[in-house]
Structures are given as C-alpha cells and as structure tokens.
C-alpha cells in the first residue's frame, strides 16, 4: 500500500524500492511485479500504456484465473523491460477488476476514457467480454482476449489469443465420432461459453453422422438436476443409449460437472458387469475442466476423461516456455498464463514511437509472432481475428494430464 501511495504521489524512486521489496517477498504474485515495472516505466518517462481486465474479487476460482492471466502479462512486461523497451520507453500495465458482466461494461467505459491506453487484454469470461465489447468498439480500442472462447464474440476491434470453441468443439466431435456414434451433453444453457461449445460440437458431430441424444442438453445448473438419474437415463432410455458424455460446464458449475463424472464412473462399473457387458460411457470435456481442482477433487472419478485445451506445458513446443515460467513463478503455470503472455506479446509487437489506438488496432491484423516470441506456438490471426491453430487433446491418466499425441489419434 505504501508503494501504491508513493506511485500515486509521483515519487517513483520510493515506489520502486518498496515494490522491489514486495516482489522479493512474493515471488508468485504477478500484481506486485506489474506495479514494480510500472514504477520503473514512469520513472523512465513516456511509457506505453496497456490495460488488463481480470476478476480479482471474492470468488476464489475467479481470483485464481485472474492471477494466472496477470502472470502472463507481467512476464511479457518484464521481458520488454529487459530488452530496454522501445527506444528506452517501457510498458505500463493498468490492472482493472471486473468480477461480473455488469462491472465489465463499466470497466470498459472507464478504460476507453483514459486516452493513454492503447490496447486492452481481457476479459476473462465470454460473458464479461460480450458485455464490454460494444464500449471498446465505440472508442476504436483494440481488445484481445486470452481466455474468452465463445463463438458468439465477433467484432472488428476484438481479437483472440486462444483457440475459439470452433476449434475445440470440432476437435472433440471428430475424436468422439471415430469410436462413438451417440453423445449426450451436460452444460449450462445460460452461459455463452457452454452454449457456444455445445453448438459447435453438435453441428460437427451431426455433420459427421453422429447423433446427440436428449437434445439440446441436460442443464447442469437446474435446481432439480440429479446427476445419478440423468446419467442412468442417458445410458438406458430407449431413445438415448449414449456412448459419450460431453461435460461443458461454465467456470461457475465445474464442481457439478465433476460430481456428474463421479456418477458416470459409478455407472460404468455397473455397465461392465451386465450380461452381455455394455461399453462404458466415455467422458469428454472442454477447457473449463482443465484445472488442478479437477484432478484433486475428481480423483479416480475423472480417470480417462478427455479434455481439449488451447495449450499444454508438456508438449514439445511449449516445454521451453513452461520451464522458464515455472522457474520465474516458483511453480507450474496454466494455459491462461501462456495465452495471456501471447496476447501481451501481440500488442507489444504493434507498438511504435508514435503509437495510437488506431495504429495498434491496424497493426494487430498483421501481427505474426514466431514460436520463440510466444509461449511456444506461432501467433497469427485469421481474417476473422481468430488465432490460427488446433486444440490439443489430453487424457487424465493416473491422476495426471497426459497428451494424446497425433499418432495416437
């Protein structure tokens, strides 16, 4: 707090000293590292300013996601400083907190009013991003999300540093259809993310010749939802007989999805003992279940779960960045840190001596980053401002996430 006070009073040297102490004491905290680098940038003079919008309120999952995003942004800011910025000008990062979609719109309005802000990284959820985009469009302010994957987000100022649900849903549909022809979907109908990935999966699966039973979905969030009953119905009902269960919770209903996985695992034990034995119900999911929480609270019940993700620290391409980051933060990083680093790198690439919101927005369209400038995979945008590239499939084996390599497909 003293550091923040010194910074606000323009006493940057004092702020630098205080934030340096805070950084040394909290190696894992990206916020203090950003404040430290902001103070250095101000002291140096004429910093370039970008904003990052993350949820930093009471909800622990949201806070964790927010911190993961900030780690990626802090790492890019730090790297820019180590290269002495651009002609000696460093980067200042404004951190804004949006814990819900109402707040997201307000935050976007505030950021657009600050004319020094050249670009925005955010928001975390597709819900929040959707609420905020119209404000950025009015101000012609580029926004690049590293975590919002919904296909319903499309705007001339909106870019994505993460694969959209188009890529994830398609990958899951193709993988499922290779071995199973009937699928059931558990999702939250009120979430743009859940709806988006469900729609892509359904369209693609049906196009291949598969059938989604109990359409359009089983609502995980309904007050009457009974996982045991719904799983049994999906397997046994004459018009169902699903072979695959797709779990598409939003970030707020992941615990219900993990409970559902538990019921599927229980049901699979019964299916094996039937005469004749019935094949097990295969579980698949999107990236909302790609968390340590899934492994710890799911335990044996999530064994065999297949998840499509945007980035995985064990792949050949990601290893070098993942190891460097783990040393920096004192522990493994998540995909959110990787894609947020990439989002910040894309914005940094557009900076020039006389950068304006307009030059940044136009620059993003032509950004091309090599694998050595990102978290491991090249970054280019399609004409729709989507990130080029494929989702990665993982399986939970022995309580760990393991890559399903293309040769295993």
Question: Where do the PLM segments sit?
Answer:
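Extracytosolic ligand-binding ectodomains
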Residues: 1-409
């Amino acid at each position: 707090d003293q550091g923040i006070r010194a910074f606000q009073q323009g006493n940057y040297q004092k702020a630098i000293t205080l934030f340096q102490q805070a950084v040394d004491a909290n190696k894992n905290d990206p916020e203090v590292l950003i404040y430290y680098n902001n103070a250095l940038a101000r002291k140096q003079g004429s910093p370039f300013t970008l904003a990052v919008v993350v949820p930093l309120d009471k909800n622990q999952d949201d806070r964790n996601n927010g911190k993961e995003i900030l780690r990626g942004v802090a790492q890019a800011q730090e790297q820019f400083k180590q290269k002495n910025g651009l002609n000696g000008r460093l980067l200042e990062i404004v951190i804004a907190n949006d814990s819900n979609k109402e707040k997201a719109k307000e935050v976007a309005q505030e950021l657009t009013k600050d004319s020094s802000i050249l670009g925005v990284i955010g928001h975390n959820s597709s819900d929040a991003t959707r609420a905020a985009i119209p404000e950025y469009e009015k101000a012609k302010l580029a926004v690049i999300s590293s975590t919002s994957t919904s296909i319903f987000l499309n705007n001339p100022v909106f870019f994505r540093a993460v694969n959209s649900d188009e890529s994830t849903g398609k990958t899951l549909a193709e993988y499922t259809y290779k071995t199973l022809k009937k699928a059931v979907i558990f999702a939250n109908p009120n979430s743009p993310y859940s709806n988006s990935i469900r729609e892509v999966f359904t369209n693609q699966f049906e196009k291949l010749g598969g059938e989604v039973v109990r359409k359009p979905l089983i609502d995980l969030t309904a007050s009457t939802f009974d996982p045991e009953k719904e799983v049994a119905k999906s397997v046994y009902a004459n018009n169902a007989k699903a072979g695959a269960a797709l779990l598409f919770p939003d970030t707020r209903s992941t615990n219900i999805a993990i409970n559902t996985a538990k019921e599927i695992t229980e049901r699979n034990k019964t299916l094996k003992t039937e005469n004749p034995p019935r094949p097990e119900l295969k579980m698949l999911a999107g990236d909302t279940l790609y968390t340590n929480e899934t492994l710890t609270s799911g335990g044996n019940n999530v064994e065999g779960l297949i998840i499509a993700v945007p980035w995985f620290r064990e792949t050949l391409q990601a290893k070098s960045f993942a190891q460097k980051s783990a040393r920096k933060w004192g522990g493994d990083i998540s995909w959110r840190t990787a894609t947020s680093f990439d989002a910040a790198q894309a914005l940094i690439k557009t900076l020039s001596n006389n950068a304006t919101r307009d030059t940044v927005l136009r620059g993003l369209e032509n950004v091309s980053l090599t694998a050595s400038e990102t978290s491991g995979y090249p970054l280019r945008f399609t004409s729709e401002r989507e990130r080029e590239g494929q989702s990665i499939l993982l399986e939970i084996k022995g309580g760990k996430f393991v890559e399903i390599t293309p040769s295993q497909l």
